[in-house]
């Protein structure tokens, strides 16, 4: 049962994080007449622009989080980012709060150590070799154990922050220092991951709902500096690789529990898959589903966590997304040349409405659907390059 927004019996959804993914979740909630409250650490974040109300808070502050939850009495608390006081969510969930998909999932996936130990040690899934380190001495030992080349990441970071590749012994000190600067909560623990040989990487959007576990077609993507630049669906895979990917994803999402969409990141080598990470929420590479599927990842997420069946996920054919990346400084960003960017049929531009930029920031995305994946990617990239950003 849903109440009507702004009325006495309104069904309220509290978004923790109000970026471009949260904005699309908010819009899907609005389509169901749900009342949306958006939180973030800065004002006028994208989801705040389409919410009924908003709050600017430090979401790592458990007391501030609890005060808003007590005030708003949401039916659903929906984390959109990792940097949240997850211990407080666990505590409040034990008192009856509905955290999407679960507070456990939010806490485990906030920290690379939690989810890696779950996947490798509890679920016995294939992962890259890894070691954790708290000090520089432990870090050097971890690098030696895992071997060079290797990848270094803070256990708590996102969007590539603090991540680097150690290619020679000379990189060890620099990699440690960079990881200490890039963590979400400042200096701290890191993971050292061994290099693995893979053909490509995918995001397998996996929905856990009242009518079971459902899979979207696999999404391929290209990363640069730890952030995605293009994604496409479907990624060509062998039948055995798809079965292995779905097996891995289902084990992970069932271990995390709850209802919603999960972005399961996997490396693929031939018919073999290697688990990388999982986000218990819509995934940035999944923005392609806004043009490639009948129900986008955001629609699927909202339908799942509100208890609706998913039934069948319809995929429309070769589609792609390409990021509109800004580089500059402004508190009054403008966009031009959009008519040329959208000159071709089955091409869409989504601008996120981010209020400011200082450096490099993802400001929008181009979505295309063509006869082939190659044409979809090429046209998406070309269209994105035509968008003129005025700082």
Swiss-Prot record:
Q: What is its EC number?
A: 6.3.1.21
Q: In which pathway does it act?
A: Purine metabolism; IMP biosynthesis via de novo pathway; N(2)-formyl-N(1)-(5-phospho-D-ribosyl)glycinamide from N(1)-(5-phospho-D-ribosyl)glycinamide (formate route): step 1/1
- Where on the tree of life does the source sit, at the highest rank? Bacteria
Q: Which GO terms describe its cellular component?
A: cytosol
Q: For ATP, which residues are the binding ones?
A: 112, 153, 158-163, 193-196, 201
| List of residues binding Mg(2+) | 265, 277
Would the keyword Repressor turn up in this protein's UniProt record?
Answer: no
One of the entry's Gene Ontology molecular-function terms is: phosphoribosylglycinamide formyltransferase activity
Q: What top-tier enzyme class does this entry carry? A: ligase
Q: Where is the ATP-grasp domain?
A: 117-306
Record PROSITE patterns? ATP_GRASP
Can you tell me which residues bind N(1)-(5-phospho-beta-D-ribosyl)glycinamide?
20-21, 80, 284, 354, 361-362
Family recorded in the similarity comment: Belongs to the PurK/PurT family.
Which gene underlies this protein? purT
The record describes its quaternary structure and partners as: Homodimer.
Q: What is this protein called?
A: Formate-dependent phosphoribosylglycinamide formyltransferase
What does this chain do? Answer: Involved in the de novo purine biosynthesis. Catalyzes the transfer of formate to 5-phospho-ribosyl-glycinamide (GAR), producing 5-phospho-ribosyl-N-formylglycinamide (FGAR). Formate is provided by PurU via hydrolysis of 10-formyl-tetrahydrofolate.
A single GO BP term for this record reads: 'de novo' IMP biosynthetic process
> Which Pfam families did the record assign?
ATP-grasp, PurT_C, RS_preATP-grasp-like
- State whether keyword Calcium applies: no
Instruction: Give start-end ranges for the coiled-coil region(s).
Output: none
Sorted keywords for this record are:
ATP-binding, Ligase, Magnesium, Metal-binding, Nucleotide-binding, Purine biosynthesis
Q: Show the catalytic activity.
A: N(1)-(5-phospho-beta-D-ribosyl)glycinamide + formate + ATP = N(2)-formyl-N(1)-(5-phospho-beta-D-ribosyl)glycinamide + ADP + phosphate + H(+)
Provide the species name: Vibrio campbellii (strain ATCC BAA-1116)
């Amino acid at each position: 049962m849903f109440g009507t927004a702004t009325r006495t019996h309104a069904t309220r959804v509290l978004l923790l994080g109000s970026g471009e993914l949260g904005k699309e979740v908010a819009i899907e909630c609005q389509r169901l007449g749900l009342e949306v409250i958006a939180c973030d650490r800065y004002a006028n974040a994208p989801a705040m622009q389409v919410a009924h109300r908003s709050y600017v808070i430090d979401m790592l502050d458990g007391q501030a989080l609890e005060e808003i939850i007590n005030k708003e009495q949401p039916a659903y608390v929906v984390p959109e980012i990792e940097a949240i006081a997850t211990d407080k969510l666990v505590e409040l969930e034990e008192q009856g709060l509905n955290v999407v998909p679960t507070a456990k999932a939010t806490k485990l996936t906030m920290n690379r150590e939690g989810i890696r130990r779950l996947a490798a040690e509890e679920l016995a899934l294939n992962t890259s070799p890894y070691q954790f380190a708290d000090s520089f001495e432990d870090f050097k030992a971890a690098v030696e154990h895992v071997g060079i080349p290797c990848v270094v990441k803070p256990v708590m970071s996102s969007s590539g922050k603090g991540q680097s590749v150690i290619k020679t012994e000379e990189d060890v000190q620099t990699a440690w220092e960079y990881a200490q600067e890039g963590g979400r909560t400042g200096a701290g623990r890191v993971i050292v991951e061994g290099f693995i040989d893979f053909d490509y990487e995918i995001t397998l959007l996996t929905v856990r709902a009242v009518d079971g576990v459902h899979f979207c077609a696999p999404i391929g993507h290209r990363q640069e500096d730890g952030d995605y630049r293009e994604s496409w669906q479907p990624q060509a895979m062998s039948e055995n690789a798809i079965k292995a990917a779905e097996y891995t994803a289902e084990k992970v999402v069932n271990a995390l529990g709850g209802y919603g969409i999960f972005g399961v990141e996997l490396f693929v080598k031939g018919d073999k898959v290697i688990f990388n990470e999982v986000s218990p929420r819509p995934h940035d590479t999944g923005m392609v589903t806004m043009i490639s599927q009948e129900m986008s990842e955001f629609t699927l997420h909202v339908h799942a966590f509100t208890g609706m069946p998913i039934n069948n996920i319809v995929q429309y054919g070769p589609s792609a997304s390409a990021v509109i990346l800004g580089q500059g400084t402004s508190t009054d960003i403008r966009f031009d040349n959009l008519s040329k960017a959208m000159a071709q049929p089955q091409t869409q531009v989504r601008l996120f409405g981010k209020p400011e930029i200082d450096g490099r920031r993802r400001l929008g995305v181009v979505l295309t659907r063509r006869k082939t994946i190659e044409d979809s990617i090429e046209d998406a990239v070309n269209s994105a390059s035509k968008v003129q950003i005025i700082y």
